[in-house]
Structures are given as structure tokens and as C-alpha cells.
């Protein structure tokens, strides 16, 4: 049987339409613009998949069907200023976390979900687990990179935006840049993304069982192991959490290797050994 998907607004889950789009407002303030999400295969244990920058929930199209085969319920939001949530501004951590926590509490089975985030979505996922530990069963963060502000930080978003709109000399080194070059990034969103990536904010404690992944295949899109370690230092010890790397994967490996990514997610959730190629970072 094909995975069942949701198409109705408000808090209902419909099982009668194979082409899902769900848009819903979980807040008492009914004038607030609604966040968009898709719900696939309701009824099973829930997994929330949080996409990267300049993207949307369709980034997971290669991953979610593989998880639905194992009877998981998949929630795929479009974050503020992205995809079908493009009219929600600005894109910032606390507001996005608030919206996603409301989504989990309203639509996930039992108000609980395993949370998976990649790249900018990893920043959101980590903050979600920190700020709303009661609704996160486990956490996977891949591609977490955070940089220290410097003198060039205020002008960097404008420079990058200008390069994309102008000479185009950069050659799409990673998924976010590829999407950006296809016109999926406004100047405002570019500034919001850089405010998350380049920040001196203090990372908050994460209590749940957590897997931090660095995709370290050599090249400009390799994740920074030190940044992965920094995030892992916020995870409470003694609950089976791990920080690992995969030397054969690049930053956007959820799109490039969806079968491996889905297998990793499934194994982490059921506490099995990770697939071949993952090695613990000392």
C-alpha cells in the first residue's frame, strides 16, 4: 500500500488524497500567517524532517518514502521565508522553533516526534530539542556549521547576494548555493540565514538522545568536525548520544544519498548500529 498523505487544513488528517499539501495555523492569534507542511503516512511514530537553507520540504522527497515503508509518519514543514511559507518573515530560530513545536504537539502521534535537521535545519532542530524537550523523542543533526562573527560579517550577505545576481563566478559548491543560484534566496532571507550561520550565540543544552553527523568528503562542501564537536558538547552525557563523521559524504547528502540517509535515521531511532562508513569522532 502506498503511503497515506494529508491534504486538509486545520487539525484534521485526511487519508483520501495521494497528493498531499497541508497548511495550518496552530496559534490562538488567527491573524498570524500559517506555516505550510506536508504529512505523509499518519498513524505511525512521527518523524519531523527539517530542510536546509533556500529550500523547502521537497528536499526530503528521496528520503521520506523510504521511512514511510517502515510505517513512520513523516512531517515535512516549509520553514518561514522558504517554499510555501515564503510570506512568513523573518526567518529566525526562536520563531521557527515555536511553530515547529506547535506542529509536533498538534499533528505528531502523541504530540511527540523524532526530529531530523540538516544544515540550517540542523540549527533549528537543535534549538527545538533544547527549548521543547518534552516533544522530542530523539534528535539527528547533520551539517551543523557555525562561524564566529568578524569585521566582514555585516556586509557578507550583501556580497554573496550580489555575486549571485551579478557575475556568477562561484560554481555551486553545495546544495544551498545551488538553490540560491536558481533564485530561491532573497536578500532578506540571505541575511537571516547568515545571522544563524555566523553567530556568537550560546548553544543550549540538549537532553534527548542525539546523533550529530559531519559529512567530511574533501571539498568545499565538507562539514567542519570542530563545529560538530561544539554542538555535541551541549548534549547531556550518558544517554547513548554520538558524534560521527562519514568521509564519503558531502554536506547535502540527504539529497545525494537518500537511501543511506534514511537507513541512518531508521537505525538511530531503533538504536541499531549505524550503517557502514560512519565513524565516531573522538
From Swiss-Prot:
It comes from the Eukaryota. Residues 1-10 have a biased composition (Polar residues). Residues 22-270 form the AB hydrolase-1 domain. Residues 1-22 are annotated as: Disordered. The keyword Transit peptide does not apply. Its EC number is 3.-.-.-. Pfam families: Abhydrolase_6. SUPFAM superfamilies: alpha/beta-Hydrolases. InterPro entries: AB_hydrolase_1, AB_hydrolase_fold, AB_hydrolase_sf. Pathway: Mycotoxin biosynthesis. Belongs to the AB hydrolase superfamily. This is AB hydrolase superfamily protein FGSG_00045. It comes from Gibberella zeae (strain ATCC MYA-4620 / CBS 123657 / FGSC 9075 / NRRL 31084 / PH-1) (Wheat head blight fungus).
Amino acid at each position: 500500500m502506498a503511503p497515506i498523505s494529508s491534504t486538509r487544513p486545520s487539525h484534521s488528517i485526511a487519508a483520501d488524497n495521494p497528493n498531499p499539501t497541508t497548511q495550518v495555523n496552530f496559534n490562538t492569534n488567527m491573524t498570524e500567517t500559517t506555516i505550510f507542511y506536508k504529512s505523509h503516512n499518519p498513524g505511525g511514530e512521527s518523524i519531523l524532517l527539517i530542510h536546509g537553507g533556500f529550500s523547502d520540504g521537497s528536499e526530503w522527497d528521496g528520503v521520506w518514502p523510504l521511512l514511510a515503508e517502515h510505517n513512520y509518519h513523516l512531517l515535512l514543514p516549509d520553514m518561514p521565508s522558504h517554499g510555501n511559507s515564503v510570506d512568513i518573515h523573518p526567518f529566525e530560530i526562536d520563531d521557527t522553533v515555536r511553530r515547529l513545536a506547535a506542529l509536533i504537539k498538534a499533528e505528531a502521534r502523541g504530540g511527540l516526534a523524532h526530529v531530523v535537521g540538516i544544515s540550517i535545519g540542523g540549527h533549528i532542530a537543535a534549538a527545538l530539542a533544547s527549548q521543547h524537550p518534552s516533544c522530542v523523542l530523539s534528535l539527528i543533526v547533520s551539517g551543523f556549521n557555525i562561524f564566529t562573527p568578524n569585521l566582514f560579517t555585516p556586509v557578507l550577505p550583501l556580497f554573496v547576494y550580489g555575486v549571485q545576481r551579478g557575475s556568477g563566478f562561484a560554481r555551486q559548491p553545495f546544495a544551498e548555493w545551488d538553490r540560491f543560484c536558481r533564485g530561491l534566496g532573497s536578500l532578506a532571507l540571505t541575511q537571516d540565514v547568515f545571522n544563524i550561520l555566523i553567530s556568537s550565540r550560546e548553544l543550549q543544552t540538549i537532553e534527548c538522545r542525539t546523533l550529530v553527523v559531519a559529512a567530511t568528503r574533501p571539498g568545499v562542501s565538507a562539514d567542519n568536525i570542530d563545529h560538530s564537536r561544539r554542538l555535541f558538547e551541549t548534549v547531556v552525557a550518558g544517554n547513548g548520544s554520538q558524534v560521527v563523521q562519514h568521509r564519503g559524504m558531502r554536506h547535502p547528502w540527504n539529497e545525494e544519498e537518500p537511501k543511506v540517509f534514511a537507513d541512518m535515521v531508521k537505525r538511530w531511532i531503533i538504536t541499531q548500529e549505524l550503517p557502514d562508513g560512519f565513524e565516531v569522532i573522538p
